[in-house]
């Protein structure tokens, strides 16, 4: 009975709180400049969110303090850039110009 007497704007403000807005969905079919994105947590679970950049998947980093020493060392080694193998081409220079002097015509 009391809600019927209040104006419509006051009734809407009464329903908005930080708890309900975090739990409910967006009530718009198109939300400007936010893109559907999947967040993958370190344990493999996923969460669907809206993100300001057009990305499909965001993978959160793993906490290294929870790993064993061997796993931590293996992950840190995988992060380091790989060294490029330099290929040295050996050119055999056994060209002898005197061998071809007979083919040159003198004028």
Swiss-Prot record:
Cross-referenced PANTHER family: 39S RIBOSOMAL PROTEIN L55, MITOCHONDRIAL, LARGE RIBOSOMAL SUBUNIT PROTEIN ML55
Name of the protein in its database record: Large ribosomal subunit protein mL55
Biological process terms in GO annotation: mitochondrial translation; translation
Cross-referenced Gene3D superfamilies: Mitochondrial ribosomal protein L55 (6.20.130.20)
Organism per entry: Drosophila melanogaster
GO molecular function term, any single one: structural constituent of ribosome
Entry comment describing in which tissues the protein is expressed: Ubiquitously expressed (at protein level).
Gene: mRpL55
Keywords: Developmental protein, Mitochondrion, Ribonucleoprotein, Ribosomal protein, Transit peptide
Highest taxon listed in the record's lineage: Eukaryota
Subunit structure: Component of the mitochondrial ribosome large subunit (39S) which comprises a 16S rRNA and about 50 distinct proteins.
Pfam families (alphabetical): Mitoc_L55 (PF09776)
Interval spanned by the transit peptide: 1-16
Disrupted-gene phenotype: Flies do not grow after hatching, moved slowly and died as first instar larvae.
Function field: Involved in mitochondrial biogenesis and G2/M phase cell cycle progression.
Protein's cellular compartments: Mitochondrion
Any one cellular-component term (Gene Ontology): mitochondrial large ribosomal subunit
Family assignment from sequence similarity: Belongs to the mitochondrion-specific ribosomal protein mL55 family.
InterPro entries: Ribosomal_mL55, Ribosomal_mL55_sf
């Amino acid at each position: 009975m009391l809600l019927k007497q209040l104006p419509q704007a006051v009734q809407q403000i009464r329903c908005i709180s930080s708890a309900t807005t975090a739990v409910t969905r967006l009530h718009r079919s198109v939300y400007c400049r936010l893109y559907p994105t999947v967040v993958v947590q370190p344990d493999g679970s996923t969460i669907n969110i809206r993100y300001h950049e057009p990305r499909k998947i965001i993978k959160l980093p793993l906490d290294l303090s929870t790993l064993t020493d061997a796993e931590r060392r293996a992950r840190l080694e995988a992060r380091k850039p790989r060294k490029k193998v330099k290929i040295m081409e050996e050119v055999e220079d056994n060209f002898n110009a005197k061998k071809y002097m007979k083919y040159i015509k003198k004028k």
